[in-house]
């Protein structure tokens, strides 16, 4: 978890143990490092950033207002779960050990030291058969899970959308957005309440008398949900999310999720282009995207008439209507002394005004294209003749279509190539590193909480890292940053406190306590406060000095 937090929030945490550090100072009179307490923890800086861009109040709005007795403000449940998501804790059970018993982290969530040690209430303690742990933790893991799934899907969706709005207002995104849209399956078992199901073909490892590594196609039932996302390719931030059951077709929600993305960034930014995969090949939807002034790029299916026409036209491009371009790139392979360079060629043929896309119209494939007055709408096509030195046969050539300009076919080609970023940097990363498919409970509500919180934290932590880079740039130019102003405020609140690090532990003390524990007399302060070196040792360790 620590390495994950360092990567995502660019800070460092250690185990707080005031007694151990006090004993070390008393006996050895040395320490590794010491900072004033304005060197806040990783989450404290992150929470400050959320307040600065006005996202923190949105966390308070997640309260479903269903608690009859509000012993604990709902925001505290949200903050703990947020830490679970960012800390990449795969299951709910380890949350107790990694978060709920950590006094420093729970302090940031609003719990005090007594609650961390003794729990926030006595409910269930009399019925407990096992011995009570020395540190109960601020919450029970089951309580956290039961409370967090009470957030309604509508509140979660609003939280995500408003968070993206705040990022757009903070000018995190480029002025003209080039986006990608794709879906991913959120597979579960049939035991999840509210899940959908679909009968799909899957390739599995073959058994029996078959070649090594040979795969066999079998049909299986899949259960779960499907997640739609609009992804801003430059920053790597998802700007709109939609969830439905797993059997729904890809093109069902493309217009809805695109409209939401436009709404989320409309105050300061504009979506200029959208790349989609073959699963979104629906003429009616693509026509609607075109009417919104958004350029799209999509590959055609191999058996379509438009695909065959484009390939045939690419063979006879000498007539002057087509545009052929070749790009050479040097790719380095190997490491050290074994490195070698390879010249990689890619050849494209741009075909303007392809007239055989008769499915591209307001009615889609349902339109009567045989009518005498039917006029097909032209689209521009790009045929890939050679891709990274690989020249496939004509019937295997990839064909893209776009409603955008075709001055340079590589603009279309590169734009579609960016679509792989949503697969690798969003869906694969959130599943593998953010544990997207590990909800707090095996229910529809649990899945919605996990998806929206993971996607929101993915967006906000990415923006936070970008913000830190900007703060460092301003600091290098000699300009005051909001980070520095925040540190000054912390220094005023904690000007007499120090945080002392000894190996993997740290402790927080008043400044005179650190000095006196290391056996350096502070006569005036000791007299005014009536403290001694021994009394300070006992205060933190509960023991008499050795």
Where are these regions (language model features)?
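Charged, often Cys/His-bearing segments associated with DNA-binding zinc-finger transcription factors
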Residues: 1-50, 525, 531, 536-539
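Short, conserved catalytic/metal-binding motifs centered on acidic residues
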Residues: 80, 95-96, 138-144, 175-187, ...
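Electropositive, glycine- and tryptophan-enriched low-complexity nucleic-acid-binding patches
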Residues: 205-267
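Basic, short loop/linker segments at the boundary and entry of helix-turn-helix/winged-helix-like folds
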Residues: 33-82, 134
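An anionic, glycine-rich sequence signature occurring as long contiguous blocks
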Residues: 2-15, 102, 292-421
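Short, solvent-exposed helix-loop connector elements
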Residues: 62-69, 410-418, 432-449, 468-476
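A short, flexible helix-boundary coil/loop motif
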Residues: 318-361, 432, 437-438, 444, ...
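Active-site-proximal, Lys/Arg-enriched surface segment
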Residues: 141-228, 540-541, 545
């Amino acid at each position: 978890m620590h390495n994950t937090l360092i990567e995502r929030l660019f800070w460092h945490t250690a185990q707080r143990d005031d007694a151990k550090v006090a004993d070390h100072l008393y006996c050895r009179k040395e320490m590794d490092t010491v900072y004033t307490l304005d060197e806040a923890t990783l989450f404290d800086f992150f929470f400050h950033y959320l307040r600065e861009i006005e996202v923190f109040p949105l966390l308070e709005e997640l309260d479903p207002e269903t608690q009859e007795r509000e012993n604990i403000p709902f925001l505290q449940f949200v903050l703990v779960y947020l830490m679970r998501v960012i800390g990449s804790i795969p299951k709910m059970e380890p949350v107790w050990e990694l978060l709920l018993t950590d006094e420093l982290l729970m302090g940031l969530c609003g719990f005090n030291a007594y609650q961390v040690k003794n729990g926030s209430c006595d409910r269930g303690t009399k019925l407990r058969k096992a011995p009570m742990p020395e540190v109960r933790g601020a919450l029970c893991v089951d309580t956290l899970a039961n409370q967090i799934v009470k957030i309604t899907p509508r509140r979660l969706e609003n939280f995500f959308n408003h968070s993206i709005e705040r990022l757009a207002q903070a000018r995190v995104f480029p002025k003209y957005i080039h986006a990608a849209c794709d879906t991913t399956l959120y597979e579960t078992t049939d035991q999840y309440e509210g899940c959908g199901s679909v009968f799909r073909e899957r390739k599995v490892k073959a058994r029996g008398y078959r070649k090594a590594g040979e795969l066999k196609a079998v049909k299986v039932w899949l259960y779960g949900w499907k997640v739609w996302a609009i992804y801003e390719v430059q920053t790597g931030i998802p700007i709109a999310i939609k969830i439905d059951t797993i059997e729904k077709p890809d093109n069902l929600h493309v217009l809805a999720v695109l409209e939401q993305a436009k709404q989320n960034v409309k105050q300061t930014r504009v979506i200029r282009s959208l790349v989609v995969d073959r699963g979104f090949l629906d003429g009616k939807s693509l026509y609607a995207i075109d009417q919104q002034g958004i350029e799209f790029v999509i590959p055609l299916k191999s058996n379509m008439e438009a695909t065959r026409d484009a390939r045939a036209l690419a063979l006879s491009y000498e007539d002057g209507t087509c545009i052929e371009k070749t790009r050479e790139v040097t790719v380095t392979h190997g490491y050290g002394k074994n490195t070698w360079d390879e010249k990689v060629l890619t050849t494209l043929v741009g075909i303007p005004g392809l007239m055989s896309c008769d499915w591209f119209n307001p009615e889609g494939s349902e339109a009567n294209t045989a009518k005498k007055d039917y006029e097909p709408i032209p689209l521009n096509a790009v045929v890939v003749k050679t891709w990274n030195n690989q020249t496939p046969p004509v019937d295997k050539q990839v064909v893209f279509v776009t409603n955008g300009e075709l001055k340079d076919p590589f603009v279309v080609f590169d734009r579609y190539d960016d679509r792989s970023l949503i697969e690798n940097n969003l869906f694969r990363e959130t599943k593998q590193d953010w544990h997207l498919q590990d909800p707090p409970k095996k229910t529809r509500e649990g899945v919605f909480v996990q998806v929206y919180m993971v996607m929101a934290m993915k967006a906000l932590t990415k923006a936070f890292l970008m913000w830190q880079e900007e703060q460092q740039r301003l600091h290098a130019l000699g300009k005051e940053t909001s980070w520095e102003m925040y540190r000054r405020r912390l220094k005023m609140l904690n000007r007499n406190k120090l945080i002392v690090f000894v190996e993997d532990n740290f402790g927080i003390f008043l400044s005179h306590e650190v000095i006196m524990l290391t056996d350096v007399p502070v006569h005036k302060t000791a007299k005014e406060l009536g403290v001694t070196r021994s009394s300070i040792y006992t205060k933190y360790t509960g023991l008499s000095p050795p």
